[in-house]
């Protein structure tokens, strides 16, 4: 410790800042002095323990007394500790400790999160296992720690002399030579090959510019020129952390500063621009007040003749109208004069404003009232330029209390410094689909010259959202394949779906035997569906497929054949139905077909597991599933219970998947099989099972007559493959749909049609929304309450009752009586909606039909028309307003058409979450129900890009953007 010397400067605390710190600490009280004393004590104690020097021991004693020492002694002591730590003063000591902590944090972060980017380096790709920087033997030497350098991205080195072209960075741009790849034959469609036409040097230069632009979008908002610290903090606190976040705050609408060019009618939603004539807060009573703002606007009068316009120059400019904007307040606190003064001062006389809302005409000519409106103040200079050029004016939504005008100004500044070449998507792709560049899209949506330009910019941003989702999905599928040939074949099958099938001769022996046991022949559409599913089952990746077809088209037997294909290969199959009645029906149907099979030495073992299965029998079934004794299990939610363990589950079929929640449908994915099972049903078509098969999640086949919007959205986006059965079995007679209002006249006509059908030997379902009468909803008809009424109305016919509260035996008995003809009228709830098969049922009556969804009504209609009789479906609405929605079902019996209607009404749901309705939060611009036609274009573009470069190495900027937009954790397993 003899080397430790305290200079006079250090003994004087080194700087004024040190003394001020001590003074502040002293002023804050004894608690802070104790904290500082403990901090110094720990530092000096470590040195004293290591050195055993008398000086450090004496200093340790002084530190113990720091909290009670005088101010000047505290100052001297701090300087001694700083010198002991080999620092000039306390400032130097604090800076060193801060640097050590930052370095420690960086090392830890880079070790745990290798995708973290330091400085302005090139983004690290998330889709490949890139080697660390330290493993490269020919790296440009820099004084920077190698552990913080980025990973090489693509071929070709940058010349160090040219690095000054890029933004200032933490380390040089790194690229890697890779001349081992040979040119390959292009399998893309005509016009889809584009990289072969571009020189390598040009691609590298373009990629460099794009990377610089991507770094610009990722820069912090406080780096924007001319933005004050206060404004940058406001933007950051409202979520605008980066330039990209700011540019993605899009206008909610555009104002046409030329105003309306049409006649104004009551109820129209219009946008006007005008000047405030008056703003007045009025106290109408002791507890009621309102604000009235009068705005003068100019519109062109279409009601005037051309002759009038030619004689009057003033008329050519249009006529003036007056908008009375009114907002009402109730409560005594809203009648105080200070409040009234404050609200009327928000809109000053002479302000230029943009108003949007619903108009209502007043008695005075050219005077209109608006009670629901949005009002935005415009700037005179902006208004004059926009009006002179006829440009639309963007109206931004406020966020976090920020003024829309302020947001508009900041966005305009960002557009001025936006790089010209910033598009990661190849120009050939945007050119083929007639889309603008990314720079033009940002400018076009924020500062459009015309509404058409704004619409084109919106299409480009929508295309980006769809394209990256499609590209991520296809890229992930390609990475699961090994060879280039396999990847080419997969892409070709996506281009030509007709190839996605196998011939019947390639089916397993068990599947072909089951097909022969059917008492009827499959339709061509059914055979095509089976071949397509079996093709998917033979692939080395888990299947995720939706089987869609109208009610009664034969989806169940197609699923049975898919299960036989899996069982014939030595694995297990699970079939989950939403109701116990349907599970029993499927079990009995499959059992009978297996008994009729011929030419099979050992038939598959089938089991039934529902909530009503006795405990002892349920335990035996679980043991047989775990051991592999049961090859095919049919049941309800019991199949996904935690107690259930499968020996070798290979396929999970979810029947009527719209009845299950997102979590329930996903639980099958957790039922991984760990070992191969030797089939108890016969010889396996394959003797060996690959190790990859032993850890792969089971295939999932979902079936639905009307897909819920979320499933339809996933199918359109490509995360679910779609198989559609378009044909119907021969002899199937279409069901007539009739709509009635639930008044006395309508009910009388319904009963008349029921009696006519019963006299001809038919059987009638009558479905109600509730079981018992409800006091909260007295207008709803109840099944149990209506039983007595219907029985008296049809005394010559027997009536039965079926609902969900009944015991399983009672429900089965009621259904069997109706099936056998013992009862001719069955009053029920929606428990019969799914899968109940009574061929002689010829009429379906749905009371209070507006209480059911479109999918439910389509399913209920499918319970009739399964035999040779002509069938009818009668939908009874409670009011006239409900008939409009019900008429949609009367116009079509196509499940996909009705699913699109449901999609339009409800939205596609949370794509990556658990919500079943609403709009996609991941896509701020796209609306699937409106912009769904662009999905196919995005899919084609993704196929073209991956066809030209399977690993996206030819498009490094695109790959980096994909890594940021669609990380693996979002794509799922």
UniProtKB/Swiss-Prot annotation:
Pfam family, one: Helicase_C
GO cellular component, one term: chloroplast
Annotated function: Plays a critical role in recombination and DNA repair. Helps process Holliday junction (HJ) intermediates to mature products by catalyzing branch migration. Has replication fork regression activity, unwinds stalled or blocked replication forks to make a HJ that can be resolved. Has a DNA unwinding activity characteristic of a DNA helicase with 3'-5' polarity. Plays a role in recombination surveillance and repair of double-stranded (ds)DNA breaks in the mitochondrion. May be able to dissociate D- and R-loops. Able to complement UV sensitivity of a recG deletion in E.coli.
InterPro entries the UniProt entry points to: ATP-dep_DNA_helicase_RecG, DEAD/DEAH_box_helicase_dom, Helicase_ATP-bd, Helicase_C-like, NA-bd_OB-fold, P-loop_NTPase, RecG/Mfd, RecG_dom3_C
Entry binding sites for ATP: 549-556
Domain Helicase ATP-binding: 536-725
GO terms, molecular function: ATP binding; ATP hydrolysis activity; DNA binding; DNA helicase activity
Major localisation: plastid
Disulfide bonds: none
Expression sites (tissue/organ): Expressed in most tissues, not seen in pollen, ovules or developing seeds.
Catalytic reaction(s) noted: Couples ATP hydrolysis with the unwinding of duplex DNA by translocating in the 3'-5' direction; ATP + H2O = ADP + phosphate + H(+)
All copies of domain Helicase C-terminal, residue ranges: 746-904
Region (Disordered): 174-200
Gene3D superfamilies hit by this protein: P-loop containing nucleotide triphosphate hydrolases
Free-text comment about domains: The first 208 codons are able target to both the chloroplast and mitochondrion.
PANTHER family: ATP-DEPENDENT DNA HELICASE HOMOLOG RECG, CHLOROPLASTIC
Motif annotated as DEQQ box, chain positions: 655-658
Ranges for region Sufficient for chloroplastic and mitochondrial trgeting: 1-208
Keyword DNA-binding attached: yes
Name listed for the protein in its UniProt record: ATP-dependent DNA helicase homolog RECG1, chloroplastic/mitochondrial
Compartments, as annotated in UniProt: Plastid, Chloroplast; Mitochondrion
């Amino acid at each position: 410790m003899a080397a430790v010397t305290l200079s006079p400067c250090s003994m004087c605390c080194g700087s004024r800042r040190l003394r001020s710190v001590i003074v502040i600490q002293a002023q804050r009280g004894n608690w802070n002095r104790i904290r500082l004393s403990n901090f110094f004590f720990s530092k000096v104690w470590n040195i004293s323990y290591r050195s055993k020097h008398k000086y450090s021991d004496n200093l340790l004693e002084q530190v113990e007394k720091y909290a009670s020492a005088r101010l000047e002694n505290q100052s001297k002591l701090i300087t001694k500790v700083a010198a002991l730590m080999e620092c000039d003063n306390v400032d130097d000591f604090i800076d060193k400790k801060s640097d050590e902590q930052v370095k420690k944090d960086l090392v830890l972060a880079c070790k745990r999160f290798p995708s973290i980017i330091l400085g302005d380096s090139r983004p690290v790709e998330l889709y490949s296992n890139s080697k660390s920087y330290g493993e490269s033997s020919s790296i440009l030497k820099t004084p920077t720690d190698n552990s913080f350098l980025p990973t090489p991205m693509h071929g070709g080195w940058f010349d160090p002399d040219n690095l000054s072209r890029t933004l200032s960075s933490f380390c040089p741009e790194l690229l890697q030579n890779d001349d081992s790849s040979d040119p390959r034959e292009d399998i893309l469609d005509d016009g889809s090959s584009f990289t072969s036409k571009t020189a390598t040097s040009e691609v590298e230069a373009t990629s460099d510019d794009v990377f610089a632009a991507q770094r610009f979008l990722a820069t912090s908002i406080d780096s924007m020129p001319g933005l004050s610290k206060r404004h940058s903090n406001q933007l950051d606190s409202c979520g605008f952390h980066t330039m990209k976040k700011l540019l993605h705050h899009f206008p909610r609408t555009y104002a046409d500063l030329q105003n309306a060019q049409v006649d104004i009618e009551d109820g129209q939603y219009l946008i006007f621009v005008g000047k405030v004539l008056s703003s007045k807060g009025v106290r109408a009573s002791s507890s009621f007040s309102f604000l009235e703002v009068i705005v003068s606007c100019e519109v062109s009068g279409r009601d005037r003749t051309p002759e009038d316009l030619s004689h009057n120059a003033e008329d050519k400019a249009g006529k003036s109208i007056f908008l009375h904007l009114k907002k009402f307040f109730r409560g005594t606190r809203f009648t105080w004069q200070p409040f009234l003064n404050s609200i009327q001062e928000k809109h000053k006389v002479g302000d230029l404003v943009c108003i949007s809302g619903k108009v209502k005409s007043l008695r005075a000519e050219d005077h209109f009232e608006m009670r629901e409106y949005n009002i935005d103040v415009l700037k005179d200079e902006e208004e004059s330029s926009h009006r002179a050029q006829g440009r639309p004016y963007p109206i931004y939504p406020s966020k976090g209390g920020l003024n829309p005008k302020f947001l508009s100004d900041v966005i305009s500044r960002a557009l001025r410094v936006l790089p010209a070449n910033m598009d990661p998507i190849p120009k050939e792709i945007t050119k083929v689909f007639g889309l603008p560049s990314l720079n033009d899209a940002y400018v076009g949506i924020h500062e459009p010259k015309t509404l058409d330009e704004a619409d084109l910019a919106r299409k480009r941003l929508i295309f980006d959202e769809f394209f990256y989702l499609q590209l991520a999905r296809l890229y992930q599928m390609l990475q699961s394949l090994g060879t280039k040939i396999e990847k080419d074949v997969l892409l070709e099958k996506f281009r030509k779906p007709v190839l996605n099938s196998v011939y019947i001769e390639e089916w397993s022996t068990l599947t072909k035997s089951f097909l022969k046991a059917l008492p009827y022949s499959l339709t061509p559409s059914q055979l095509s569906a089976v071949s397509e599913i079996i093709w998917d089952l033979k692939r080395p990746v888990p299947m995720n497929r939706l089987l869609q077809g109208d009610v009664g088209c034969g989806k169940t037997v197609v699923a049975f054949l898919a299960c036989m294909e899996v069982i014939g290969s030595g694995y297990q199959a699970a079939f989950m139905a939403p109701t116990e009645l349907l599970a029993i029906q499927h079990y009995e149907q499959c059992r009978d077909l297996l008994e009729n099979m011929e030419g099979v030495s050992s038939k598959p073992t089938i089991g039934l597991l529902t909530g009503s299965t006795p405990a002892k029998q349920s335990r035996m079934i679980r043991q047989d599933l775990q051991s592999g004794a049961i090859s095919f299990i049919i049941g309800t939610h019991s199949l996904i219970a935690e107690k259930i363990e499968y020996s070798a589950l290979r396929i999970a079929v979810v029947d009527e998947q719209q009845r299950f929640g997102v979590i329930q449908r996903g639980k099958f994915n957790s039922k991984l099989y760990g070992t191969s099972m030797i089939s108890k049903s016969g010889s396996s078509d394959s003797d060996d099972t690959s190790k990859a098969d032993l850890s792969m999640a089971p295939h999932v086949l979902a079936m639905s007559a009307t897909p819920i919007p979320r499933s339809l959205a996933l199918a359109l986006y490509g995360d679910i493959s779609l198989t559609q059965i378009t044909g119907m079995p021969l002899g199937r007679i279409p069901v007539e749909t009739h709509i009635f209002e639930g008044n006395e006249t309508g009910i009388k006509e319904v009963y008349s049609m029921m009696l006519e059908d019963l006299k001809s030997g038919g059987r009638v379902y009558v479905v109600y929304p509730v079981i018992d009468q409800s006091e909260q909803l007295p207008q709803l008809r109840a099944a149990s309450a209506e039983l007595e009424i219907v029985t008296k109305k049809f005394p010559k016919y027997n009536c039965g009752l079926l609902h969900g509260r009944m015991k399983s035996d009672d429900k089965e008995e009621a259904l069997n009586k109706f099936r056998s003809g013992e009862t001719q009228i069955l009053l029920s709830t929606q428990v019969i909606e799914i899968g109940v098969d009574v061929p002689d049922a010829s009429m379906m009556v749905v009371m209070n039909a507006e209480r059911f969804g479109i999918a439910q009504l389509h399913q209920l209609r499918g319970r009739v028309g399964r035999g040779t009789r002509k069938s009818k479906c009668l939908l009874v609405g409670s009011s006239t307003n409900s008939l409009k929605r019900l008429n949609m079902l009367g116009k079509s019996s196509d499940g996909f058409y009705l699913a699109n209607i449901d999609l339009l009404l409800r939205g596609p749901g949370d794509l990556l979450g658990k919500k079943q309705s609403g709009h996609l939060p991941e896509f701020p611009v796209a609306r699937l129900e409106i912009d769904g036609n662009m999905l196919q274009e995005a899919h084609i573009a993704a196929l073209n890009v991956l066809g030209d470069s399977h690993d996206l190495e030819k498009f490094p900027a695109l790959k980096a953007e994909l890594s940021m937009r669609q990380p693996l954790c979002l794509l799922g397993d």
